[in-house]
Amino acid sequence: MEGLGGFLIPLILMFAIFYFLLIRPQQKRQKQIQEMHNNLQRGDKIVTIGGLHGTIDSLDESTVVILVNDNRKLTFDRSAIREVVNPD
């Protein structure tokens, strides 16, 4: 029986380390992204995952219309928004 316990403890320890170093931070980041997408508002300055900078003109449940240079309007999925940029 001692051999089984000697094998099981390192396995559990490796799983715990894997969870706290890889899985938990990813879940936390995903929650932050979802919260940011839910809090988008008209007038927010944003950056898309493709690097396009613009201002939100309008939005609905799944899409966002972004105003870019020369008042051009582009439509993106909400999931394409990488970050909201705070104007300084």
From Swiss-Prot:
Task: Supply the alphabetized keyword list.
Answer: Cell membrane, Membrane, Protein transport, Translocation, Transmembrane, Transmembrane helix, Transport
Q: Which residues cross the membrane?
A: 3-23
Compartments in which it is found: Cell membrane
One annotated GO biological process: protein transport
**What's any one GO cellular component for it?**
plasma membrane
Q: Does the keyword Membrane apply?
A: yes
Is Transport among this UniProt entry's keywords?
Answer: yes
Q: In terms of domain of life, where is this protein from? A: Bacteria
Protein purpose: The SecYEG-SecDF-YajC-YidC holo-translocon (HTL) protein secretase/insertase is a supercomplex required for protein secretion, insertion of proteins into membranes, and assembly of membrane protein complexes. While the SecYEG complex is essential for assembly of a number of proteins and complexes, the SecDF-YajC-YidC subcomplex facilitates these functions.
Matching entries from NCBIfam families are given as: yajC
Similarity field:
Belongs to the YajC family.
- Name under which the protein is recorded: Sec translocon accessory complex subunit YajC
